[in-house]
């Protein structure tokens, strides 16, 4: 299965919405929500829901990080794992295999998210400076910039994952069974 450019854009926008929604506390960053959206966009909702359910089971223990540890990000199985499960279904990749193949992405995405949080902490000083100058428009922009930054990062991850699905299929086919 090939993914059209329009589907890549939709997956990117869906990922942006899901990642930015995490900041609002609306739980759009859960595997089930992300995978269902990708499944709907790619026209295979049952596989999307199955991948989301398996991802939720796998991430059940990752709900709370202990100490300074940060668990892998659910975008791995929620976005990339679902793309793998749907596009490589004809190649014998099932939902369980797609979950296993998506964990390196989950770890990599967590590094990206941590770097994004680190960058976004600098935006707070701009908000304080704008308030000191009574620049309320600047404050609104600085205060909401974190959501915009996360949306852009989410779009890049979603679009990149969907756009590179053919290359990903070639890499996976090189892995010995």
Q: Where would I find each of the regions flagged by the language model?
A:
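Hydrophobic, small-residue-rich transmembrane alpha-helices and their short perimembrane loops
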Residues: 45, 53-124
